Amino acid sequence: VSPGEGDGPVVTAVRGTDVDIRTEDGTVDAYLTRPVEGGARPAVLWYMDAYGLRPRLREMADRLARAGYTVLVPNVFHRRGRAPVVELPEFIDAGARPEIFRRLRPTMRALTPERAMRDAGAYLRWLAECPAAAGGPVAVTGYCMGAALALRTAGAYPDRVAAAAGFHGGRLATDAPDSPHLVAGRITAEVYFGHADRDRSLPPEQIERLERALTDAGVRHRCEVYAGAGHGYTQSDTAAYDKEADERHWAALLGLLARTF
């Protein structure tokens, strides 16, 4: 796949491999991609959307690797099995979505914040020992449910996360006692969120609550609503895809990484 416009320094070739990561709760299958040449690169931990580790995410991770980064995409649903944990069509249209989520919902609920952050520690330790990853802090980015995981990871491991981003995230600032936004006071990273417009999983009151939490905590951040873009706008294998919003996401993510590393 050719590099996208505005990706910054372009690497001519990347190498993607499937890797296994040991955790306290078993083995995680993951995708690692990095530039073929140039030695160790700054590392990015990439949190999947609910549809999981699949060709679209590998394609996106490869694009980020071509911009000069080592990217790790773990299957966060590993407790249910190796990816894909449910059968997916090549293209997920609006009609297929409800049934896929019906099958995924128990697995999503089973990934508690405690389990997810225990896993995050394993991912970060693995990257610290990975020869393709430069030493020092990493960046984290997440999509859909992964946006909340990115935010939580920045709060749980402030000494390891220098930048955190989330795109078309949902339920980021709820009334729950373990809502993701409540970690804001522990974050030292720079944070960016690109919210979907008219997203039922992230209504305006949650956007305002998240903004207030980050501001009150003194977190360097920017939160933007992508007008007209629906939930899932970065995923070209779904009916939610919005090319203009996706390219805006790339510009924002690459800008954040350029400021960080």
Region roles according to the model:
Residues 1-261:
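N-terminal cap/leader regions of alpha/beta-hydrolase-fold enzymes
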